[in-house]
Amino acid sequence: MQKDASSSGFLPSFQHFATQAIHVGPEPEQWSSRAVVLPISLATTFKQDSPGQSSGFVYSRSGNPTRNCLEKAVAALDGAKHCLTFARGLAATTTITHLLKAGDEVICMDEVYGGTNRYFRRVASEFGLKISFVDCSKTKLLEAAITPQTKLVWIETPTNPTLKLADIKACAQIVHKHKDIILVVDNTFMSAYFQRPLALGADICMCSATKYMNGHSDVVMGLVSVTSDDLNERLRFLQNSLGAVPSPFDCYLCCRGLKTLQIRMEKHFRNGMAVARFLESNPRVEKVIYPGLPSHPQHELAKRQCTGCPGMVSFYIKGTLQHAQVFLKNIKLFALAESLGGYESLAELPAIMTHASVPEKDRATLGISDTLIRLSVGLEDEKDLLEDLGQALKAAHP
């Protein structure tokens, strides 16, 4: 059991997680060299034994030894039977929606990553899909939104950037009253270490591996994990047909990142909690949002559903947009940048940066105001992070 999580009342850590992260996938026995580090297979094509008879690989878009090792590793960490990798998180999203046809309806969480919102609102809707944005944290609203045409429900938990939670198990029970609806959970913020959506009833667990799963801000990638053989076959066909697969080198980097996922996430949790507590006690801060804090309205759900919390902390600085901008101008350790989940600490202003594509009216409804600041708390020394935040807050409010 993870010490920090268990002492805070969260679920115990998933058994054998670190061992699987290190050993599942690139087993040395599969290579003639017995290399203990995953080899990078850059070949685009593979020699066949006879016409139409291969030894497992034909063309790198359809399958690659390095990519296969990563997919095997992620499947184990997600508690899944299968995993598919994609060139981007949005490539994974696009591929999933190709399971549908024109006229089908998608229910999407009202608050999601800005790129997901933009894709559903401005791209998928142009191809005959009907998109409804619903607050799926309120299960009655989800149930009321389902129609005979609903074929996919997309939830993100915690949401980006206000860290609202959806009860995955409750959503799954509602969705699966209807046999032909697929429940997708975007698990980017939690990673496989803190949350396993498939075990809670989701049909598809997807995430942007760009963030915590890789953890080094040097790979852009999407992951999709499933337990259903049927879904795997359909998605595997689409993966090959659409061709949005990652490079072997990126697969190598991500597989390497997984080796330290456990120790990284534990440090993110410790630092995230320390930052959240510091901000909550600071008079220059209006409100702090962090599922690990008892003040979070869904703190109990977080403890039932997760083994801990990542380093994502959002807060409202007192004042106006100008105060937020002065704060962001004065941070030193926290880099002003989009993205999240790397070893380095980042800060951003969602209303102007990651969620600028969300309509202003929707941002106001969701609480994405000009004073909302999102932090991705990294792995630096806790004391240094708190000092940096403290001096930047003082600069914003002398």
Curated annotation (Swiss-Prot):
Residues bearing the modification N6-(pyridoxal phosphate)lysine: K211
Catalytic activity, reaction form: L,L-cystathionine + H2O = 2-oxobutanoate + L-cysteine + NH4(+); L-homoserine = 2-oxobutanoate + NH4(+); L-selenocystathionine + H2O = L-selenocysteine + 2-oxobutanoate + NH4(+); L-cysteine + H2O = hydrogen sulfide + pyruvate + NH4(+) + H(+)
Keywords carried by this UniProt record: Amino-acid biosynthesis, Calmodulin-binding, Cysteine biosynthesis, Cytoplasm, Lipid metabolism, Lyase, Phosphoprotein, Pyridoxal phosphate
Activity-pH behavior: Optimum pH is 8.0 with L-cystathionine.
Modified residues (Phosphoserine): S50
Cofactor(s) the protein requires to work: pyridoxal 5'-phosphate
InterPro entries the record matches: Cys/Met-Metab_PyrdxlP-dep_enz, Cys_met_metab_PP, PyrdxlP-dep_Trfase, PyrdxlP-dep_Trfase_major, PyrdxlP-dep_Trfase_small
Source organism superkingdom: Eukaryota
Pathway: Amino-acid biosynthesis; L-cysteine biosynthesis; L-cysteine from L-homocysteine and L-serine: step 2/2
A Pfam family reported for this protein in Swiss-Prot or TrEMBL: Cys_Met_Meta_PP
A GO biological-process term: negative regulation of cell growth
Subunit: Homotetramer. Interacts with CALM in a calcium-dependent manner.
Descriptive protein name: Cystathionine gamma-lyase
Origin species: Rattus norvegicus (Rat)
Record gene name: Cth
